[in-house]
Amino acid sequence: MSYELPALPFDYTALAPYITKETLEFHHDKHHAAYVNNYNNAVKDTDLDGQPIEAVIKAIAGDASKAGLFNNAAQAWNHSFYWNSIKPNGGGAPTGALADKIAADFGSFENFVTEFKQAAATQFGSGWAWLVLDNGTLKITKTGNADTPIAHGQTPLLTIDVWEHAYYLDYQNRRPDYISTFVEKLANWDFASANYAAAIA
């Protein structure tokens, strides 16, 4: 059973002008598709074939002999999570239980935004910044290249992709502008809230 490239949860033009159709076509149809294809080819006919991709990632994390499989599995999963972390008319702030938890663990939503932006901006090279639940506490973490919180026992709630292919066509070297736009215009707090609710259920 192969892992299928998920369709975008919005139209290719839905995030413009913040993320353009051209960026989404390259990012989803080329980059993400390549990770999915590489993963399916690498896992085929192994004893992990047919396992959910999350289980494969957790099983092989830290195994240097399976680094290629891990990188493609994690990147396939990370991207699927990222597409749900953004939406048209996103941004703003969460409400309800997640809003209360952010205020409790970060002091305020404004503190969270500052820390999240800093983590995303200071990820050296390619990678990701995440809002995660870790042993009952909300934390911001960043992962390099293909690494993912699910390999470290954390529950991701929201992510931003800071690989250059996520923003370079639209923002060139202005990663901080892309990060600010994500926070203010794109972040899908409904998705993050649903992930939080599931994690504490």
From Swiss-Prot:
UniProt name for this protein: Superoxide dismutase [Fe]
InterPro entries noted in UniProt: Mn/Fe_SOD, Mn/Fe_SOD_BS, Mn/Fe_SOD_C, Mn/Fe_SOD_N, Mn/Fe_SOD_N_sf, SOD_C_sf
Listed cofactors: Fe cation
Binding-site positions, Fe cation: 27, 79, 161, 165
Task performed by this protein: Destroys superoxide anion radicals which are normally produced within the cells and which are toxic to biological systems.
Enzyme class: oxidoreductase
Annotated cofactor note: Binds 1 Fe cation per subunit.
Quaternary structure annotation from Swiss-Prot or TrEMBL: Homodimer.
Family, as annotated: Belongs to the iron/manganese superoxide dismutase family.
UniProt cross-references to PROSITE patterns, sorted A to Z: SOD_MN (PS00088)
Organism of this sequence: Synechococcus elongatus (strain ATCC 33912 / PCC 7942 / FACHB-805) (Anacystis nidulans R2)
Single GO term (MF): metal ion binding
Coiled-coil residue windows: none
Taxonomic superkingdom: Bacteria
Gene it is expressed from: sodB
A Pfam family the protein falls into: Sod_Fe_N
Keywords: Iron, Metal-binding, Oxidoreductase
